[in-house]
Structures are given as C-alpha cells and as structure tokens.
Amino acid sequence: MSTNICSFKDRCVSILCCKFCKQVLSSRGMKAVLLADTEIDLFSTDIPPTNAVDFTGRCYFTKICKCKLKDIACLKCGNIVGYHVIVPCSSCLLSCNNGHFWMFHSQAVYDINRLDSTGVNVLLWGNLPEIEESTDEDVLNISAEECIR
C-alpha cells in the first residue's frame, strides 16, 4: 500500500478490546478512517490478530470501491468486530493509507492507549517494535481491569 507520502509515526498505538465481551483483540491498533468514506471512523492493525478473531461468512465487495473483504468475529463471544481486506483495490492502494488490512468497527471495539516501556508516555507507531502479534505476551495478557478502564 502507498505509505510514502503519508506518515503515521506520530499516531498513538492502542490496545483494541471487544465491546461485547472485553476480549483483547489486538495490541497494535491505530485509529483510522475508511478510505472510501472518510466520515466513518474505525480502527486498524498491521498484523493479523492471533487467537482473538476468525473469519466468518463469505467474501464481499463494497459499493464504494472494489476491495474484496471478509468479516472477522471475536473468538470469545462470536460477534462480528470488523473485517479483513483480502484483496485491496487499486484506488485504495494508491490512496494515502497506513498499510493495514485488518479493520475493526468503532461500534464493536474500544481502545486503550498503549504505554511505552517507561509506563508513562503513550506509545507511538514510530517507536513500536516490529514483532509478531502473538509474541507480545505482556500486552495480550493484560488484566480484565485494564481492559475495562
């Protein structure tokens, strides 16, 4: 995806939790807007969430663009929480974007700002280590109280 013109390094990293059951879905979330309709707020992540969501239903296309999408549901409660861009369309690839293909509906998840290693400052995308989602045990095993705050 085209990210050379746009910079997302100053965006806050969020922990994304399911609104229905409070399950942690991702420790690498970012607030975003839908490329095809910038009035729609959502969250996104760059790494496939592990042991948190799975595909549900059939692939579909939107009326606004030609991206091929598939819904994702929370593994704990079964509610649809977002979608995965299976095949992005050329207009979305050429747009200013963050390179993320995993999207979460703002009506289905809530975010918690993730702190840096000092535990004081909000972690920014420019300082985020490039590691696998599944190896980030400290963040994925956060307490229920942390997710509820």
Curated annotation (Swiss-Prot):
One of its GO terms (cellular component) is intracellular membrane-bounded organelle. The keyword Cytoplasm applies. Its main location: cytoplasm. Keywords: Cytoplasm, Mitochondrion. Induction: Up-regulated in peripheral blood mononuclear cells following Epstein-Barr virus (EBV) infection or following transfection with EBV LMP1 protein. It is found in: Cytoplasm; Mitochondrion. It comes from the Eukaryota. May be up-regulated in malignant colon cancers, compared to normal colon and colon adenomas. Expression is also elevated in other common cancer types, including breast, lung, uterus, and ovary. Highly homologous to GCUD2 but localized to a distinct locus. Interacts with UNG. Belongs to the FAM72 family. May play a role in the regulation of cellular reactive oxygen species metabolism. May participate in cell growth regulation. This is Protein FAM72A. It comes from Homo sapiens. The gene is FAM72A.
